[in-house]
């Protein structure tokens, strides 16, 4: 004899078996819902690869085209046309590459995350999407204080989001190398942005110091 959840016996006929099977499937679905755990961060890899790839490609979109020259350009013409955009392109491309590497390394270190971490990762990816916009402005008006500060502030936001995500990924685990590698660019970009507000042409040299983040992490690990 089959007993219903209310405690009343059911007839051992077709109706009773259907009732039991239906409620058993409901109970199984409830147990499955309770077993849903943290989000698998590896699912973000394909999305992040696409976003980084498109953003890093669009960095070259604002480079001057051949149509800007009325005649065959001289070396001086080429330098005047391409110097500033290429400087901005190289800084942004290397920065994006470093953060792409850091992003994938972080997903490997912390393969699971909460909804909040997933949402923060999406905000981080949005900041990467916007990089071609600020890069285009900086390439055209590199010596302008307002544009230089805007570009530096954007780099600082990207670095800060990356560092925050590393803090969340490493919570409860002290790893000086990884934390230093993530935090170092934040201070470099912040200092460079302050300098950009005062002496815009010097800021680009300070921002390039962020490329030494892996070295800073390596030195921190050896102490």
Predicted regions and their residues:
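Multi-pass alpha-helical transmembrane bundle typical of ion/small-solute transporters
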Residues: 19-223
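Short, low-complexity intrinsically disordered segments enriched in A/P/G/S/L with frequent Arg
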Residues: 7-12
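Short hydrophobic transmembrane-like helices used for membrane targeting/insertion
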Residues: 1-2, 26
